[in-house]
Amino acid sequence: MANIKSQMKRIKTNEANRQRNKAVKSSLKTAIRKFREAADAGDKAKAVELQATAGRALDKAVSKGVIHSNQAANKKSAMAKRANQL
């Protein structure tokens, strides 16, 4: 454990950020998984709706600094490609 006051504060901040990032990433995975399940089932209407929801979640994660913008763009592109194949 750190003895320096600023480092003790930093440890708390890092832990709070880690938990927030973990929650955001978990919700992203859930949103993308729901889209994939709808796409696998062949439900085009539901897949398109879930694609939009997951896309918004990815954009929010980028704005919070949880994931890189290129990673979000790559995932959104893959979802769009999958939705267009239905």
From Swiss-Prot:
Entry keywords, A to Z: Ribonucleoprotein, Ribosomal protein, RNA-binding, rRNA-binding
GO biological process, one term: translation
A GO MF term: small ribosomal subunit rRNA binding
Keyword Lipoprotein annotated: no
Pfam families noted in UniProt: Ribosomal_S20p (PF01649)
GO cellular component: cytosol; small ribosomal subunit
Residue intervals passing through the bilayer: none
Ranges where the record places region Disordered: 1-25
Chain's role: Binds directly to 16S ribosomal RNA.
Entry's family note: Belongs to the bacterial ribosomal protein bS20 family.
Protein name: Small ribosomal subunit protein bS20
Gene assigned in the entry: rpsT
